[in-house]
């Protein structure tokens, strides 16, 4: 029987073989395709990739951060999650208040210049310390703009009100499960210019059939090697959490990607991953005593039977 992880591995192969070379915002360069879809049956295991280790702890803490409506990296740092640091750090080193060493193009330079990387690491550690310990600094430079959490939980209307899209869609699933409007959008054109990183995973829709909850994500832009594995696990986890509250079983996670790309400095890592054989997906267990998705904490989420191949490191394009 075909392993479900091949949905992802086939995406990697397809882009490596048929992708178009493109320049990008980060200056790194990519090969990409436009319009690709993967499907995962969540009843047959939790799709946490096994051909490389994907840190579930980071996936879960980021999702809980989104669900809280938080847009400041302090919560993530408190949970030893550094995946959003570079975007907040960028706003700090580009500000008039920053007086440290030149950090222009720190993403690429830290990969190419060992001496610079020492300076970069020192400045990043200092930045993280200030976000954690200095409220004023955190409020100013730990903030990422109106990113996912804000749009999910407090979408601004032209009337000056706010919409809690996530709470509303959960209520709709309970009351009108056959609705075709079970949608949450993170793409607010008015707010995009002020965001540290405009939403890559832009819109998701739920579908209820035969007592099962399915979710489809439309992702405008997908970093196949680093980002997509997180996105698969994150939205699969979100589907499990909402199904739990609504008294439903889990159905499918359908992942539709607009610009699906592999960065040119990830080719070697992708080839290494493609040479590995998938292992059985793990099982996700939720604390049955927690009834609302908004009450889940890290200790309420457990992954069992996860035996992946080793992690494969790769640089982040900022």
Swiss-Prot record:
(6R)-5,10-methylene-5,6,7,8-tetrahydrofolate binds at residues 223, 317. DUMP binds at residues 25, 180-181, 220-223, 231, 261-263. The active site is at residue 200. InterPro entries: Thymidate_synth/dCMP_Mease, Thymidate_synth/dCMP_Mease_dom, Thymidate_synth/dCMP_Mease_sf, Thymidylate_synthase, Thymidylate_synthase_AS. Pathway: Pyrimidine metabolism; dTTP biosynthesis. CDD domains: TS_Pyrimidine_HMase (cd00351). GO terms for molecular function: thymidylate synthase activity. GO terms for biological process: dTMP biosynthetic process; dTTP biosynthetic process; methylation. It catalyses: dUMP + (6R)-5,10-methylene-5,6,7,8-tetrahydrofolate = 7,8-dihydrofolate + dTMP. Its main location: cytoplasm. It is an enzyme of class 2 (transferase). It is found in: Cytoplasm. It holds the Pfam family Thymidylat_synt. Its EC number is 2.1.1.45. Keywords: Cytoplasm, Methyltransferase, Nucleotide biosynthesis, Transferase. GO terms for cellular component: cytosol. Catalyzes the reductive methylation of 2'-deoxyuridine-5'-monophosphate (dUMP) to 2'-deoxythymidine-5'-monophosphate (dTMP) while utilizing 5,10-methylenetetrahydrofolate (mTHF) as the methyl donor and reductant in the reaction, yielding dihydrofolate (DHF) as a by-product. This enzymatic reaction provides an intracellular de novo source of dTMP, an essential precursor for DNA biosynthesis. HAMAP family: Thymidy_synth_bact (MF_00008). Homodimer. Belongs to the thymidylate synthase family. Bacterial-type ThyA subfamily. This is Thymidylate synthase. The gene is thyA.
